[in-house]
Each structure stands twice: as C-alpha cells, then as structure tokens.
Design a protein with these regions (language model features):
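His/Asp/Glu-enriched, well-ordered alpha-helical/loop segment
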Residues: 423-434, 441-464, 474-478, 489-610, ...
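C-terminal functional module detector
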Residues: 582, 590, 604-614, 623-626, ...
Length: 677
C-alpha cells in the first residue's frame, strides 16, 4: 500500500498546497525549521462538497448563524483558503480557547499553514472559487499525533518476516507454529543454511507461566536450519543450537558491554541473548534488499499516516536507518516529519568527544534529506523489568517470586557520571538527550546525569527526556519539573495483563508495583508529559493508547491498573500526544496546536474524541491526515481503505490469550505490551 495519497484532481495552479518554509515566523523561535521547506506537489480535490457556483455558493455550505470573529484577519479572493474543515469539534490544544467560544472550523492556507480558526460563519470569508470545503459532521479536528518514541523502520523490517504476534503458547504449540513457518519460508529448499527468522516472540509467553526458553526446545524442530526468534520487546533473542554454533557462542563467550549471554546451571548458553548480546547472532542474519526494505517501510509509514501520526521521533537510528530515510524521501514516500535519535552504545557513552564527532558526521551527511530534522541522541540505560529478562535497573533487588530478595538489581549500562558528562557535551553543542529508563534506578541515573549537565552548562531549556518510566521512585517525581526533563510515556502498557501482573508483581512486590507508569503522579509533580507508542513493540493502536492513558485498562486489559491514582484526564492525554510531544521535539512553535500561523498538521476523525465515551476512543478512525497542508491520508481513497483495513486487522490480532491474574482479584484478557527499545 503506497504511503502517499492516491492521485488527486488538481483544481488550478493556485490550489496546490505549499508546506511552510523554514523561514516561517511561526517557527522562528526555539523550534527547528520545518522539514517541508520545498513546495508540495499535491493538490486538493473538491470531493463534491464545493458548489460550482463559486464563492457565494460555497459560502452557503459553511452555514449561517451569528457571526463570530475568526482568529486571523479576513482574507478573500486570491487569498482564499485551500481547504476549510467545517462543522467540526475542533480541539485546538490552546489554553483558554473554550472561554472565547467553541471553535467549529479551520481554514488551511495555500502555504500549508493554518489560516484561521473560528465558527463556520466567521470562516465563510476564506472560501473562494477553488477552496475545498469538507464537512466534519460534528467530529473532531485536532493536531496530528506526535509520537515521541517509535521505531517505524523497525516496523517495516519486521513486516518482512513471519510473526508470532506475541502469542502465549506451550512449547508444543510453539513448535507446531514454527514448523509451519519452516514450510512457508522455503521448506526443504532452504535446508540446511537458510535462516528462519521469526518476529514478535513473547519472552514471557511460554506456558505454563514461568517456563524458561532453552535452545533444546527449538532444536526439536524438523530442520537443520539456524532458527532465531526475535523478542517483540526488542530486548530478547532466542536461538537454536545451529545459530549459536554459527555465531561461535559457547560457555566461554563473555557478556558484551550492554548485553547478556544467558547461561544455565551447567554454564552453557541457553540460547537466550539479551540486549546488546543479540548482535552476536543478528549481525550474521542475511539482510533484506534495499528495495524490499524501502517498500516495506513506505507501507508502514502509510499506516502511521492512516492512524493520524504526523510527527515521529525515531528512537533508534544509525547509518542504516538514515540511508533508508534518504531513499524514502527521494522517492516521495516519507509522509511524516521525522526527528531521528542517533543511538549511542555503552562504549560510545563513555566517550563524549568521539560520540559528538560521530553524531555531527551523520548530521552533516544526511541533514539535507527532506523530512528529517536532527538534534536528538538516544542512550539505553537499562533493559526490561519483566520475568525472565529482569535487566531493568532497580534501586532494590528483584524478588524470587516468593517475596524473598535476590542478588539481582538488573543491569545499568551507563553510570550517572558517564551519562552526565555525555549529556553535558551534547547539550552544550545544542543536542537533546533521550534515555531509555525503565527501572527506578535507571530513571534516577538519567536524572542525576541531567542534573550534572544542567549544573556545568548552565542550560535551563535542554529538554532532555527519559522514556518508558515503568517504575519511578516517589522521591524522583519532582525532579522532572525541577530539571525541565520530559517524561515520555507509553501508556498503552498501563493495564493489568500478563506483563504487568504474572511477569512482574511477584518479582517486585505490591509496594513497588503501585508505582507502575505513574502518569498522574508525575503530572501533579509538575512534569511535562509526552507520548510515544514504541511501535512495533506493540501493534500500532494510537487511539487505544490514548484511551488507556485515561482509563488504565484499554481495549484488552484484564482490569484497571491503579486508575484512581494514576489515570489522566482526557484533556491532559490529548495535549500529551500533541503539544506536549511537540515541546519535547522543539517544534511547538511549528506544530502541536490548532492556531493560525502554525503548520497545518491536522487530523479529521470519525467521532468526537473530546466527548464520546472513553471506551469508544479505542475505535477511532481517521478520515483525513494532513502534514504541512499536504493530504497524506484519505480514508475514502483506495490507499486509505487498504490502510484502514490493515490497521483493523492488526487491532483484532492484538488480543492475547486469557490471563486471569490481577493485582487485587478479578480477571480478563492479557496482551503483549513489553517495553521496547
């Protein structure tokens, strides 16, 4: 499915929508220039809503009623809008807007910016002979979703391999599925050297709960091929003995920096590799062709556009990913604004000068790629918290399942001192830091590092971030506001299920468990909340993500996860995933709210998410997505229908086998949602 819109009928030379230029006054302060500085090649179609009678007839479509002042000066004739969205419930995201009266219409200028907002009647003046007018039918128009932590190219690459869809299975059931994959990927013709790589393995999904993966289970498959299961969480890999042999992994293999080769009581590898140890095997897997990757990535970027995502921070980027973005942009198949976060490994984190030179080199090489804006650095501070991985760094030890402390406090991949020096070097050079911090010790390490950087650089607006925040010590809540650190959360995980209950509660105990994903506690402490999906760790379900932030259950949870204490309001949730994340990415002067002068990065939904029942938010469909005034998704186009159908299938596949555990009794269905990269 192509990610660009289907062919559109041009109205006239004047109907083409040009995205905002880098010199836009709307982005003149702290935000970076728009990546859409070149004129758009897309024109807007009439969609049968604009009467051929001209401006007067079109004005009638906007409805009558008492006039109200639009929030921009009048325009007419040649200055008419390219597009007017009318009869809408506009969520502007601008504080105090509602006190001035409801906003029901948005006019998009021919420069790709928002021309005006106001009532239907007030915006009649912006309708010209070739203006397109769209009836929102009372549904929401709002800023596009800003995804502050996502891996879209990883989603594309994963789509090229068979997927276990994070299923919970017995070893026998798993072998049956994998045997089918062997047949589907070449069968006898792939013997003995064709790799079977399977995505979305559930590291806590072997039944009965607590069953540990071992290469001997995979060795029972009827094949001599190397077999590798890639964890859906991005932190675990499970290999058969053939793959271990090819990689030369033995009892004598040491743990690499930032990773772990899991070994059994006999000292031999079990076949499970954690975090950076995965590279021992992954580097040997044959790569897909560039053409295959570009096509797959273009398709998943189209899915993101169909979900209403207009800006993404790709949270794991190196040369490989930047070359893919370059190819996508050159082909006109990059529909979103992309902020690439350059990933530094644990060794690089100890070398600020070398790392800064590395990041600057990549920026120089790729900064002309249209659609990219550089300025972000990514570092892993720890792993994941769930059993059996337990590599997230904790202040207190993990428990053994019977409530007794163990010797394990997880893995801290970078010290506070090293992270502080690294952050200071990059902040001083104008870059932002983005830390993977899942456990409470990793979160504190990030905050300690940012405190050091703030102290030595004197900067008060560095806008560094900590992502995931699965467990935060109460003593650290206020430090986010004090240090100006963004709390980037993936709140689709904040529901009761296998991952938050069976794989976690017995191993950290109820006192710590209460502080899982403490969103409202952070909000009360003054933290700036920002949102991210971590896709493809989960299937892309943007609106269920927002719904779960509000009710702490979502569409597939087994019950509420501390809703009374940690649920967010609807308003906070909408802002978190729009203007909040725009602030994190330093583009709040460009996008994130619906107000004149900002880029027209907008979504038109199929319901009013500001008023519908909370549970109904999960099923929200996106009728139209615009980026810089350019239509990148239309639900009623052939491409749009295909994308919507695929998203619906992914949402349906998201349901997981029944899991009846809960924190305080009850039951229901669990689902995969481990923290990822």
């Amino acid at each position: 499915m192509p990610s660009s819109p289907s062919p559109r009928s041009p109205l006239s030379a004047r109907s083409a929508v040009s995205p905002p230029s880098a010199a836009s006054s709307a982005s003149a302060s702290s935000s970076a220039p728009s990546p859409y500085a070149a004129p758009s090649a897309y024109a807007l179609s009439r969609r049968g809503l604009l009467a051929a009678a001209g401006a007067a007839g079109a004005a009638g479509l906007l409805g009558a009623g008492p006039a109200s002042a639009a929030s921009a000066p009048p325009a007419g004739g040649r200055n008419s809008a390219a597009l007017v969205l009318r009869n809408a419930a506009v969520f502007t995201g601008v504080t105090g807007t509602d006190r001035r009266g409801p906003v029901r219409a948005v006019a998009v200028g021919r420069d790709g910016k928002i021309l005006a907002t106001g009532t239907d009647a007030a915006l009649r003046r912006y309708v010209g002979r070739d203006t397109e007018v769209v009836d929102a039918r009372g549904n929401t128009v709002m800023s596009g979703i800003h995804d502050g932590h996502v891996h879209p190219l990883g989603a594309g690459e994963r789509s090229l391999s068979p997927s276990l869809e994070s299923a919970e299975t017995t070893p026998a059931e798993l072998l049956e599925i994998l045997t089918g994959f062997l047949a589907d990927t070449g069968g006898a013709g792939a013997e003995p050297d064709g790799w079977l790589v399977v995505e979305d393995w559930n590291p806590v999904g072997l039944l009965p709960t607590g069953t540990a993966p071992h290469h001997s289970m995979l060795d029972a498959l009827p094949t001599r091929r190397p077999v590798v299961l890639i964890g859906g969480d991005g932190h675990n890999l499970w290999a058969n003995q053939r793959a271990l042999d090819i990689a030369g992994i033995t009892a004598a293999t040491p743990d690499p920096v930032g990773g772990k080769v899991v070994k059994g009581a006999d000292g031999k590898p079990t076949g499970v590799l954690k975090d950076d140890a995965q590279g021992l095997v992954r580097r040997l897997i044959p790569e897909h062709t560039r053409a295959e990757l570009v096509a797959a990535c273009a398709e998943v970027l189209g899915l993101a556009a169909a979900s209403g995502v207009t800006t993404m921070m790709d949270a794991l980027v190196g040369r490989h990913e930047l070359e893919l973005y370059q190819a996508l942009s050159a082909a006109g198949r990059l529909p979103q604004r992309i902020v690439p976060a350059i990933r530094l490994d644990a060794d690089q984190a100890r070398d600020p000068a070398g790392s800064l030179a590395y990041a600057r080199g990549l920026r120089r090489e790729f900064e002309e790629v249209r659609g990219l804006r550089f300025g972000m650095i990514k570092v892993f501070l720890d792993g994941v918290i769930e059993y059996p991985a337990q590599t997230a760094a904790l202040l207190e030890p993990y428990l053994d399942g019977n409530g007794r402390p163990t010797a394990n406090r997880g893995e801290l991949y970078t010290s506070a001192a090293d992270y502080g020096r690294l952050s200071a070097a990059f902040n001083r050079a104008g870059w932002q830091m983005h830390a993977h911090g899942l456990g409470d010790r990793a979160v504190r390490t990030a905050l300690d590092g940012y405190a050091y950087a703030r102290r030595v650089t004197g900067q008060r607006d560095a806008r560094n971030a900590v992502a995931h925040l699965q467990l935060v010590d109460p003593a650290d809540l206020r430090r986010f506001a004090q240090l100006g650190v963004a709390a980037c959360m993936q709140l689709q995980w904040a529901a009761r299920d296998t991952w938050t209950v069976e794989a976690l509660l017995p191993y950290i105990g109820p006192e710590r468990h209460r502080w899982l994903y403490p969103a409202r506690s952070l909000e009360k402490a003054g933290a700036r909340l920002t949102g991210g999906s971590d896709w493809p760790v989960d299937s892309l379900q943007v609106w269920n993500q927002l719904r779960t932030a509000i009710d702490r259950q979502g569409s597939e949870g087994a019950g509420e996860l501390y809703r009374e204490k940690e649920a967010l309001s609807r308003d906070t949730t909408l802002r978190m995933h729009t203007s909040g994340t725009a602030w994190q990415l330093r583009q709040e002067q460009l996008t994130g709210t619906v107000e004149p002068g900002k880029a027209a990065d907008l979504v038109l939904l199929d319901r009013d998410v500001t008023r519908c029942p909370v549970a109904d938010i999960s099923g929200t469909g996106v009728r139209m997505t615009l980026v810089g005034g350019r239509v990148v998704h239309e639900a009623d186009s052939a491409a749009g229908r295909a994308a919507s159908a695929r998203l619906a299938r992914a949402a349906a596949a998201g349901a997981r086998p029944a899991s009846y555990a809960s924190v305080h009794g009850g039951g229901g269905k669990g689902r995969h949602h481990a923290c990822g990269h």
